[in-house]
């Protein structure tokens, strides 16, 4: 895929096609890390850091609290561990 670099004031920029934005799950305004390696420009999305308030807002504070025995006693293997 070819993308043209265009003059943007004293800088230069390029437009990332929407299909690429969707494939990489990028949003307008999101930051990326830029690095040059072997004469290539590599852009890596920077993961969003959530605040404690944002994380707690996603919790169901009325959910029943399970005892440790319930959690461990009824668990199933998640990988290659042996039970």
UniProtKB/Swiss-Prot annotation:
The keyword Transcription regulation applies. It comes from the Bacteria. SUPFAM superfamilies: AbrB/MazE/MraZ-like. One of its GO terms (biological process) is positive regulation of cell growth. One of its GO terms (molecular function) is toxin sequestering activity. Residues 3-48 form the SpoVT-AbrB domain. Keywords: DNA-binding, Repressor, Toxin-antitoxin system, Transcription, Transcription regulation. InterPro entries: Antitox_PemI-like (IPR039052), SpoVT-AbrB_dom (IPR007159), SpoVT-AbrB_sf (IPR037914). GO terms for cellular component: toxin-antitoxin complex. Antitoxin component of a type II toxin-antitoxin (TA) system. May be involved in the regulation of cell growth. It acts as a suppressor of the endoribonuclease (inhibitory function) of ChpB protein. Both ChpS and ChpB probably bind to the promoter region of the chpS-chpB operon to autoregulate their synthesis. This is Antitoxin ChpS. It comes from Escherichia coli (strain K12). The lineage of its organism: Bacteria, Pseudomonadati, Pseudomonadota, Gammaproteobacteria, Enterobacterales.
